A protein has these predicted regions:
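Electrostatic, structured charged patches in enzyme active sites and in nucleic-acid/phosphate-binding
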Residues: 1-86
Length: 86
């Protein structure tokens, strides 16, 4: 469903394009695959991972990646019929 929302945003011109299943590797060999890397028409970009439940493993890898690189991984969760991104 989030994928469909991204497609609609591309058609509306809000998003230029997006990549899915983007691997981010750490020197330790740890890898986190982020669901979406979104490139907006105003030049911004965001990493957004769609989650039902936040597992301890995901939270640990997210922290390791954010500590190692100058990026922030946002979380998308569906609440009712709306998406919440934080």
């Amino acid at each position: 469903e989030f994928h469909q929302l991204l497609k609609l945003s591309v058609k509306a011109g809000e998003i230029l394009f997006f990549l899915t299943d983007v691997p981010i590797r750490l020197k330790s060999g740890t890898k986190l695959i982020v669901d979406n890397l979104i490139f907006y028409s105003d030049g911004r970009y965001e990493f957004i991972d769609v989650k039902g439940a936040l597992t301890p493993v995901f939270l640990l890898k997210k922290k390791q990646v954010e500590d190692a690189y100058p990026l922030k991984i946002k979380i998308a969760k569906k609440k009712g019929k709306r998406w919440s991104i934080y």
